[in-house]
Amino acid sequence: MPQHDQLHRYLFENFAVRGELVTVSETLQQILENHDYPQPVKNVLAELLVATSLLTATLKFDGDITVQLQGDGPMNLAVINGNNNQQMRGVARVQGEIPENADLKTLVGNGYVVITITPSEGERYQGVVGLEGDTLAACLEDYFMRSEQLPTRLFIRTGDVDGKPAAGGMLLQVMPAQNAQQDDFDHLATLTETIKTEELLTLPANEVLWRLYHEEEVTVYDPQDVEFKCTCSREHCADALKTLPDEEVDSILAEDGEIDMHCDYCGNHYLFNAMDIAEIRNNASPADPQVH
């Protein structure tokens, strides 16, 4: 049976190593449902969703993380944004033919991974790593070694459960300021690598952890729900319209009679007529009606 989208944190009592396990199905389906992506693009977004959830769970503060793939390939952009409450959204842009069995480098071409961390309070941090690994997991492991000098392993699996897209992943990381033995970390990584896609996507988290680590002492913490949530709003659209030259806005109104702002993440449409624009320019709140 497919599990509810959740993230589980766990800790090895005898090693200075922490872990995370996440499975997503409903959240992934909501990200994909408003778009007709080729299967390889769906797979990349699934991997990005898992990776972003795992990375967001490493935050020690309120804020969000955006994990973005950019390049000159036929999929020139893929991005997932998530916050410390495990609220996720994402989108991809395709500008060319996608081979049926395209791998990551074929999709992105010459590109890189951008990780942007935005605390609710404090300065934003951005890290960039070249798309040198063969997988997203390998690229992100490289990011952790360069930016935080913390040995980190990611294990990401994608597939279908009951005919619907699903994905899951696990993260192992040496605890900051701890001296975990490399042999111990490698041992745990070797165990984790054996997880089968079907097991990860269909079994309860506690059973997965027992199958992998039944000879180790593991503390598992209360799970956190993962969900799709878009941050778009009529107010955000109004703020965006304020940044456009009046002439450009008036030209669209004259030609179309209204301005239709579409959210790529969730598919919502926000309509603004001439009266709405006048209210925006007068710093009043635009009328409430909204079309989905």
UniProtKB/Swiss-Prot annotation:
Its BP terms in the Gene Ontology are: protein refolding
Q: Does the keyword Disulfide bond apply?
A: yes
Question: Which cysteines are cross-linked by disulfides?
Answer: 230-232, 263-266
Chief location of this protein within or outside the cell: cytoplasm
Q: GO cellular component terms?
A: cytoplasm
Which SUPFAM superfamilies does the protein's record reference?
Hsp33 domain, HSP33 redox switch-like
Q: Which UniProt keywords apply?
A: Chaperone, Cytoplasm, Disulfide bond, Redox-active center, Zinc
Per UniProt, subcellular location reads as: Cytoplasm
What Gene Ontology molecular-function terms does this entry list?
protein folding chaperone; unfolded protein binding
> Posttranslational modification, per the record?
Under oxidizing conditions two disulfide bonds are formed involving the reactive cysteines. Under reducing conditions zinc is bound to the reactive cysteines and the protein is inactive.
Q: To which protein family does this belong?
A: Belongs to the HSP33 family.
Q: What does this protein do?
A: Redox regulated molecular chaperone. Protects both thermally unfolding and oxidatively damaged proteins from irreversible aggregation. Plays an important role in the bacterial defense system toward oxidative stress.
PANTHER family hit by this protein: 33 KDA CHAPERONIN (PTHR30111:SF1)
Q: What is this protein called?
A: 33 kDa chaperonin
Record the organism.
Shigella boydii serotype 4 (strain Sb227)
Q: Identify the coding gene.
A: hslO
